[in-house]
Amino acid sequence: MEQNITNILIKKIEELTETIYDETIRLEEPPSISLGDYSTNISFKLAKLLKKSPMVIAEELTNLLISENIEGIKEIKAVNGYINFFIDYNLYSKSGIAKISSEKDKFGQGAPKNKKVIIEHTSANPNGPLHIGHSRNAIVGDSLKRIVEFAGYVVEAQYYVNDMGRQEAIVVYGLDKFELNEQQKPDHAIGEVYFKANQLLNENPEQEEEILKLMKKYEEASEKGEENELTNKFNYAVNYALSGFKETLNNLNIHHDKFVWESSYVKNGMVQKVIQTLKDTGKVEKDEVYRLDLSEFGIDKKLVLARLNGTSLYSTRDIAYHIDKMKNCDIGINILGADHKLTAEMVNASLKLLGYNTPEVVFYEFISLPEGSMSTRRGTFISIDELYEEAKNRAVKEIKKRNETTEEEEINNIAHKIAVGAVRYNIVRISPDKAMVFRWDDALDFEKVGAPVIQYAHARCCRILEKENTNENKPIDATELFEYDLNEHEKLLIKILLKFPKIVEKSADAKKPQIMATYALDVAQTFNRYYANCPIFKEENKNIVYSRLELVKCTKTIIENALNLLGIECPGKM
């Protein structure tokens, strides 16, 4: 509807100005629905061109617009230079709500774009459990994957496995020194070995040479495509940790389509090819290492490509990975911590130097609990597993307090959905570029800002619809719905429900899943006000009863659709 209004508005501006108007027109929403559903200040922008007051221009444009009989618009008013549009809610409700009812979980889905997107997210080093800091990467990445896919793109989620770095060499070194606790979850067991190995290295600095030897031997074996005792140790250590990661991520409804190992680019010769190609650009300098000059891209620091002994570095392997990735997609998206900004700029500059497309990067700031931040290296961190368990335990207490159910299995099932929702939503609702403190009062808030607010609105819809099923009255024909004067709460709910397709598009285009998170909460809060002010079964008018029930059904659908795009399930009761 908005696009139709702006198209007609441009047409009328061109009639009035007798020129082609090619500027963007944005419709705003007035602070109150009583002032209109959409508004534009275009008259103020045209005042200088037409040498008239905005009030006069608004009146002239309004008269021209009224003559068009814009579909779905009941009234157009000029007020103090602004042009306000009022929706015909009886007509708008019939068509819009019918569309949600018929399309259900497909409502809002974008048309196929015939473009492939590769989103790389999580990609934590396999040297210990995923901690709360990793959760922001994984949750933002997975939510974005779901939204972009729903918007019509073919999307592949990748995990880039760092199996060649110093940290993994320390794990392999540690496995030779310490026994792996197989009673622990795999990633936690690996983390314990890594922590002990680090302590040993701190006490015996001369052992650092062993780590360098392990790294060099593993790379040499990879270059030759050899499988030996050492490569088997690395593979075992990495896969063992990854099995724990997958369990953690699966618990949060996060899945990757492909795990790409860093060493694969050494094995296939691509890393050496990248080094040589970059040398051929004449931008590489040699001192104690090989360095790439990226000053033409405004980067003063030189990128270290390789050691003089020929062994590669993470940066070179990262460039090889990105070349491969960008060759196999139309759009690449990386989710990275803000501390990786310079590295990302250097990799992208290297790709440009070689003539390749570059990925878009969504950076996120650090996340912490009120007690402080986390570090895998020190062995003092809060794992995602611990975060989830704490959320679930708190959810169980809340469910029992509300006496919604006494069945232990059902309590656990509902608590799991609330816990996942609490963790995922509390993280995704905050813009990634803002540092955040994870607070339990927000995450498990049933009243204002938490996922439980949205899930509870869904559960309320379910209860209302269960009551409908016990009602003996048969519903009227769908074409006869909304044949009465709708109140403000009904209008606001209809309006926000029908915004869903636009929110999907906006979230996907901006690469901002927090837009969807904010919208889902807005829907829940708008529905709660509707529920408080629009009685259903007490109404005698059959048209009102079934029109309002249809709104409840559609609210349930939209909440399910929105939360699904954030990886959150909706309990039928809470």
Swiss-Prot record:
PROSITE patterns in the cross-refs: AA_TRNA_LIGASE_I
GO biological process, one term: arginyl-tRNA aminoacylation
MF terms in GO: arginine-tRNA ligase activity; ATP binding
Protein's cellular compartments: Cytoplasm
Motif mapping: 'HIGH' region: 124-134
Organism per entry: Methanococcus aeolicus (strain ATCC BAA-1280 / DSM 17508 / OCM 812 / Nankai-3)
Catalysed reactions, semicolon-separated: tRNA(Arg) + L-arginine + ATP = L-arginyl-tRNA(Arg) + AMP + diphosphate
Entry keyword Aminoacyl-tRNA synthetase: yes
GO cellular component, one term: cytoplasm
NCBIfam families attached to this UniProt entry: argS
Group of enzyme by EC: ligase
Keyword terms of this UniProt record: Aminoacyl-tRNA synthetase, ATP-binding, Cytoplasm, Ligase, Nucleotide-binding, Protein biosynthesis
Membership in a protein family: Belongs to the class-I aminoacyl-tRNA synthetase family.
EC number(s) on file: 6.1.1.19
InterPro entries: aa-tRNA-synth_I_CS, Arg-tRNA-ligase, Arg-tRNA-synth_N, Arg-tRNA-synth_N_sf, ArgRS_core, DALR_anticod-bd, Rossmann-like_a/b/a_fold, tRNAsynth_Ia_anticodon-bd
Protein name: Arginine--tRNA ligase
